[in-house]
Amino acid sequence: MVACGNDAPLPEGLDAKIVEEHCKEVTRRYGLYRDTWVKEASPFIQNLKPAGLPTTVVYPFGGGDLISALTTYPEAKEITTMSLEHAGDPRRIKGIAAKQLKASLQMIRATSSGLLVANDSKTENLMKGQRGEIPGQLSFFLMALAVHGYEPVSLKYLKTNADGSIRYLTQTELTDLEKKEAKLLNKVWVAPDFSEAFDNLELIAVKKGGDPVKDRIVHRHFAQNLDDDHFGKDDGMKNYLKARTPIVAMTKAASYLLWRDAFSTIRNYLLDNMVFMVSDSTGIPPKFATKAGFVQEAWGKFNQSFLGASADYNADFVKLWKDAKPLSFRYGYLDKGLSKHMLITKKAPAAK
């Protein structure tokens, strides 16, 4: 209903006219996204990839952004996103009044516009989706599947065990956790108004008309504060990620957190386990990438970080972008001068 990905009957009691109006506008935006960003960015990035890359993607700071992950890695079979945002409770839509349904769908259109129009999602929009009748994160994920021609076939909520294995929540657990609200993961964020049972999800989807096995993708999203004081002490999450190696990675619009010492655990995980990464300037600074055996290729223009960040790393990036080739599309943040830019970080060729 929110993603308008098929013609399945609406839940009983929902106003079909309101949903029809919503889907008309959303479908229009899907078309624009496919005709602009997907057609331009996806083949460009594909041409930069070496053969034989892993099909397992890890996207830290990827709140709501499955759509860009599928554009960047259309060959992916498994995608893990992690961010401060919780997945959300889908059950509240049942029996919602027409007035509230209209307002909720308007909110989803407004908060998803950054991803669909500007290939970027503002923090404020991600926060808004943490409260209300329609869960923002889940909605964005379903919209991403619709844009890329996938149909969801399974939705489960989960937690990680200490060894990194996955434990799916049972109906009994969902009921038992009903009144235990999800934890606020950052004091400046908006607190979720739903149960902690809906922190993390697993979505399985299949390409429309495709083979249920060969054309299947698994997406897992984890509500996670990725700083060293939280992610750094979460053995279950760290072991889950280690079990996925080797991986390809991406990040964008990540507030330059990978530049900071307080996020060294997630940065080191990427450097130890990835073979290829696509990012904007919020990716990994050359100081760390070069030491770990990576080479970096810059595209577009970069003169200064969009947000305040390390002067030394800014200087390193200015050098890296000095002779960069042009970039015609936006990939995450613009720089301080509103220039488009993109960074490829890949394992250096083995010495002969």
Task: Show where each model-derived region lies.
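Non-globular targeting/processing and membrane-anchoring segments
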Residues: 1-112, 195, 202, 207-352
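Short, thiol/selenol-centered motifs that function as redox-active sites or metal-ligating centers
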Residues: 63-74, 90, 114-142
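Active-site/pore-lining binding-face segments in mid-to-C-terminal subdomains
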Residues: 143-148, 152-228
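Thiol-based oxidoreductase modules, predominantly thioredoxin-like and allied folds used
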Residues: 79-128, 153-183
